[in-house]
Swiss-Prot record:
SMART domains linked: VWD
Name this polypeptide is given: von Willebrand factor D and EGF domain-containing protein
Boundaries of every VWFD domain copy: 429-612
Keywords in alphabetical order: Disulfide bond, Secreted, Signal
Disulfide bond sites: C431-C572, C474-C483
Pfam families the UniProt entry points to: D8C_UMOD (PF23283), VWD (PF00094)
InterPro entries according to UniProt: Dev_Signal_Modulators, EGF-like_dom, VWF_type-D
Principal location listed in the UniProt entry: secreted
Organism: Mus musculus
Subcellular location: Secreted
Gene name tied to this protein: Vwde
Secretion signal span: 1-19
GO terms for cellular component: extracellular region
Amino acid sequence: MRGGAWARLVTALMLLVQGKCQQAQECSPGGHRILQSPYRSVHFDSVYLQYSAVQDLICDHSLSPGWYRFLIFDRPAEMPTKCVEMNHCGTQAPIWLSLSDSEALPLPGEMKKLTACATWQFLFSTEKDCCLFQIPVSVRNCGDFFVYLLQPTQGCMGYCAEAISDVKLHTCGPGETENEGGCVGQLSMAQPPAPPAPPGRPKISVELLGSLVFCRCTFDVSPTNTSVGFLIAWSRLSSQEIKEELRQESTLQAFSLLELDGINLRLGDTIFCSAAVFYLEKPDVQSIAVESQEFFAGIKLKPELDTISEDGKEYQLKIESTIPIVCSEFSELDQGCKISLKLKTIEQGKEHLGLNLALSSCHVDLHQNSCANGICSQAVLYYTAVTDFSRDGDRVTDIIVEPIVNDVFLWDRYAPDSIQIKVKDVPSAYCYSFTDPHIITFDGRVYDNFKTGTFVLYKSMSRDFEIHVRQWNCGSLHYSVSCNCGFVAKEEGDIVTFDMCSGQLHESPSYLFVKNQESSSSNIRITESYLGRKITIWFSSGAFIRADLSEWGMSITLRVPSLDYRSTLGLCGTFDENPENDFHDKNGIKIDHDDNYIAFINEWRLQPGRSMFDKVPASSRFPAKPSYCSCWLGTAMHHLLSHHLDSRSHLEMASGCKGIKHLQFSSLIPDLDITSEYINSEALAGKLSPHVPREENNLNFLLQKNAHPNLSKLDLNLPHPGNKILNPPAYLSDERHTQDQEMRKSLQNRWKRQNVKDFHPVYIFQSLGQGNLEEFSYFFPEDHTEDSQPEFAPSWPTASGLTEFSVLAICQQTLANSSIGRLCLPFLGRTLNHVVDMCVKDVLLKDDVNWAEGGVALLENECERRVLEDGKRNVEENRKTVEGILEVLKCPNLCSGHGECMGWGCVCSPGYSSYDCSHSYGMQML
């Protein structure tokens, strides 16, 4: 057959085929209907529709029987011939066209009867069934497109479609390859199309759909004239900080959802999503993938600072959930929808050093709320470093959250990540004003203040805390020297006056008055040691002032907390670890001229009528201080030393949230809490309740007091303050064992130097008003003496014949060879030498060896301080030394060999008394 005839035959056959197609009614525009919902795309994840737009779900159970053609975004589409995943194509059970190995799609003009399948996966099943349901479908190839004879489904199923190219639906020729239904071989040599513009950076958010939580990845897309799809990938960080892919999908929507199911994606995961754009016509042509910022799914603890100091400052701890709170249907309505968190603190390091960090609460609730700016629920609490008055170095504390117990599977047993807080150790400081007085500043500088009058011992520049002291002439036979006779201490609304300056030397009782200016409760604590020889006033900041009483007056010990570091003025110096600038003026500027210490003392001497002895400062309101908890997840006490040094019971702390102040009050010297004797309801009612001396330290007395004192607990929520008379320490004789009537009678002579009407003791227990306080004012002549430092040059031997060598031997024996001096020598160091030098000077000036014992109290206080500061470290090395120190602090001089050391102190043998059993009945005590 000739070539021309062959060509005419082929043309005729083609026209015949086309004629048959044109004759098929279903191929004509009016012979079929169009299904063009983009949700029918095999790339569309329909989970979102099930929870947010259920009305848009594809359900073909109401589809009218007939011929249909598929379009997606006005582009040709056809039913897929491969199994489609469940929850795609805008429905739960997607329907696809199943072709057996022997089956193929019809050629142009042909029609075939085929089978469609619906995919389904049963609950708790790990495998899907691609052909659980079968539906007969007829397919006609109309040349440029397919049409399908469809019928309604049995349930909420939907017919799927996938986009194809505009290329004719015919078998590709030699050298051509099919791509989404099109022949592209002839384009292989052409310039490849430019990739689409990349999307904007994806953002991950969360949303609650019903009772399920989904992560949503969204991004912006540049406008385009070409149909595009999106390739979205989800990944998370593994425990080894390596990204691992969770899921990848192609979709027509500029978002993707991933369920936070607690199995594949869990709370505590760090999640990423990436997105790329591709052409629907050419899926292999893609933009670069753009990845989101990391998204943390869970609860985070966000501290204001992760390194803080022992300075009393408070810091905010935010607890934030990036995931909405989900509650089960069984949740109690009256409890609300919330997640409850229990917080604990764990101290790092092997040494058992006690509480380091306190929280305002050990329990916090996260309530259900709407999400905003990435936060779905938030709670705030506070943390602060515990001022422990120990040189324990910088320490690290973990704040952990116990695993959550919840009915919702997603939240149950979830434990948010812990955080670490480093606490920098800041020193506390002690100042001593003893006997003459000799003053040892906070930074260790030693000087003498022989002046009389009223002085500013201490003033904080960072808070409302100030102490004034009075010094009177304390009876030297040859020289004019002074001693402390009283103090007034004020911390915010609490004012304490301890005063024996109103009477005569050796005769004046002590007057203790407590006032709170702003509320019915006071934040102080008063303790007594050694049967009244030591009186300590504890303040809520951790500061204390201690008076060691004697017949000539009192020696004063002052401790201030680390929050006053580099913020102090007054006779006690600057507290900045630099003794060179301790002599300063009222502006804190160092005094440099030759007589700097004289000028320094004059700078802090108060004019008559200007001190807190004369007038109580005006009342001020102070903000309420938040309470704090010990959330310490610690162990029970396992060292003897810890039992004595820790300010609170570790067992008590470990039991949960125990209310504490953000500082630790510690005392190694056994004390008795006598706060209620000075701050109680009887004082408010104006009832007389005299303080009974405790010199009668017989066995019955100790048994009544129930032995061992509580060295740890400080109840700072006390009743309204009152005031009382505190008798001076007893210099025991038989006549001291008298009745209350004789003691009260002795009170009548105590205001011998007052310049107002005679004192009546009942006034002390009446109103706390300003007028009453002014009524108690007295004339203090030392405020009106000439402002000059006594100049004298004492020499050896003294008038009574005491030599320097003999006095030094007495001081060495009294102090260095005392039980406290010997046992505490490793802790005291050169302080012992300072105290011995003070002793020698005291005896020289007074020409009286009885003054040698004045330094024992300083050794006791300094020893207690050193052990508290340093004793917690090297516990095993210091164990025996500290045990001995604790014994002599409890029973001074080991009861002088005339008594038995018990839990509270010395129980004296018959015929002996005093706190150390050193006094024999009938012997006048020196």
